[in-house]
Amino acid sequence: MAVAYADKPNHFINFPLTQFQGFVLNYKGLQFQLLDEGVDCKIQTAPHISLAMLDIQPEDYRSVDVAIQEVIDDMHWGEGFQIKFENPHILGRCIVLDVKGVEELHDDLVNYIRDKGCVADQSRKWIGHCTIAQLTDAALSIKENVDFINNMQFNYKITINPSSPARLEIVKLGAERKDGFYETIASHWMGIRFEYNPPTDKLAMIMGYCCLEVVRKELEEGDLPENDDDAWFKLSYHYENNSWFFRHVYRKSSYFRKSCQNLDCNCLGFYESSVEED
């Protein structure tokens, strides 16, 4: 089957960099050099890495959102990984830094998003980069500007591990920027997101098949398979591995949340009294 490409993209997967203060300090130093030299350019105010271009519609947001969470949950951190920024140069009309260390993350995002039936990545080869500024046509034609840019130096590394402030976001092309960040459709911290820890090793210790229909009614249509065996397997797997779907159900279903908190099945009488949140 032919692969569909986002050659006319309307969204992208964003890796924001503003929260990495050491990087931003050095990044702004480059921008100040350009301004001091009098290079006519538009400064980038939201430093970031575009990890994948997308051609999606609003009805695809949830699928892409889930794909991002799955990529994060399936990451093998080890000692973490480094992102290297170097070699300021001109790419098209932009002044950019080469970015190394996120190639595997790019590939995973594209593959997971495509697995959801959404269009990701372009037909041309993806080049990891971070834009510093955009040149005007006049500035691009001045040899002194080009020579100055080609002689600029930059070398910086960011270490990404589970405690880093790294995030993956869905951003619409042309989105507003504020305080160094893009307005996002969805944004997820990349760390090991044990915000909702399972209270026991086995879901069966607190729930039975009789509870599934109650949980299903509180979720969005299609979240849990209609077949109880399939639904039980899906919920149990994600519960025991503390994966994205367990946290989704925990947030969406007050009944499931209360069952986890009580370490017991309380489906009998659920409709007789309201569930109070702790």
Curated annotation (Swiss-Prot):
Coiled coil: none
Protein family: Belongs to the coronaviruses ns2a protein family.
Protein name listed in UniProt: Non-structural protein 2a
Origin species: Bovine coronavirus (strain 98TXSF-110-ENT)
